[in-house]
């Protein structure tokens, strides 16, 4: 009799679960400003707002992928404050791992160009820097950081702790690349490879650059791949402004980045837009400040968010599910 009651209760509740409101979180690119996303996620978690799907570009892909593979906001903060992360985005090598016998003698030059007059005047491209940041440290960190998550999901991003997509750019064919399977580290690494700053990587014979070139706020990917009932968007970037004579990054942005639609129709969800006056691409040391900006804005909008999203998830249950998921890591 008891088993029958349990079965009946389950069958009665099943339609509610099947029809439960699904929530998608879309995170824009924006360099260090993307640290704001962590504060948003923390505020949503603390208020029992569900996050069922995540899409992100560039820094949004980094934060989104970490959460999707089972990192808590505390875990993300700890990682992004670590010395390992500083070496990742700066390209610096620890002193103990530097092998000076392989290094050329230091010179004051920024780049070295050699000219050949043998056949015709030409610049040998191997003497131009491929990126400002040496990619070796970043590549090693990405292997260590994402390898187990890739193995646990079998290369299927739908099987992460939270289903996830990120966007990279195919600059040859002038289109976005939606990353939904394969090596998670490669997908995120491609999504944040801003031209000149970071070296691109090759995925399936395609040279993949920062997703922000063609789609810095992938709401379309969220709609097409996951069909959520409501979308929460976090926008920490703007379309390129008029370039300045002495600002190389603004010049590059204007040359390569297409305009992005950072809006979400009211009927589809909520968008939080953040404006910054003095935060640069690499200001990662300001993580506490940027986290709090996201957290405080989300808390100020919580009544509005709760009025649109009626479903709740218990934070203790999320933590338990996270532990269970990560226990399957090889």
What does each model-found stretch correspond to?
Residues 4-18:
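Sec-dependent N-terminal signal peptides
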Residues 19-57, 65-330:
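Patatin-like phospholipase
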């Amino acid at each position: 009799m008891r088993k029958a009651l349990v079965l009946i209760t389950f069958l009665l509740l099943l339609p509610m679960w099947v029809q439960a409101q699904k929530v998608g979180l879309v995170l824009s690119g924006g360099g260090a400003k993307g640290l704001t996303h962590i504060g948003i996620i923390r505020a949503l978690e603390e208020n029992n707002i569900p996050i069922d799907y995540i899409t992100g570009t560039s820094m949004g892909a980094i934060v989104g992928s970490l959460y999707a593979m089972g990192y808590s906001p505390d875990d993300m903060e700890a990682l992004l404050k670590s010395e390992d992360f500083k070496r990742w985005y700066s390209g610096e090598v620890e002193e103990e791992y530097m092998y000076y016998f392989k290094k050329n003698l230091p010179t004051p030059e920024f780049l070295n160009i050699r000219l050949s007059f043998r056949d015709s005047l030409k610049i040998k491209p191997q003497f131009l820097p491929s990126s400002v940041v040496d990619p070796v440290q970043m590549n090693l960190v990405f292997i260590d950081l994402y390898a187990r998550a890739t193995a646990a999901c079998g290369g299927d991003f739908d099987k992460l702790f939270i289903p996830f997509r990120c966007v990279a750019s195919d600059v040859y064919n002038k289109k976005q690349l939606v990353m939904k399977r394969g090596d998670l580290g490669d997908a995120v690494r491609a999504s944040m490879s801003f031209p000149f700053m970071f070296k691109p990587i090759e995925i399936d014979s395609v040279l993949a650059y920062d997703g922000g070139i063609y789609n810095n706020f992938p709401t379309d990917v969220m709609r097409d791949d996951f069909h959520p009932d409501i979308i929460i968007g976090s926008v920490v970037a703007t379309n390129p402004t008029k370039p300045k004579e002495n600002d190389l990054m603004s010049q590059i942005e204007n040359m390569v980045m297409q305009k992005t639609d950072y809006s979400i129709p009211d009927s589809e969800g909520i968008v939080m837009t953040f404006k910054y006056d003095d935060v640069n691409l690499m200001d990662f040391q300001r993580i506490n400040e940027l986290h709090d900006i996201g957290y405080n804005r989300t808390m100020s909008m919580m009544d509005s968010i709760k009025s649109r999203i009626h479903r709740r998830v218990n934070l203790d249950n999320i933590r338990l599910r996270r532990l269970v998921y990560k226990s399957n890591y090889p």
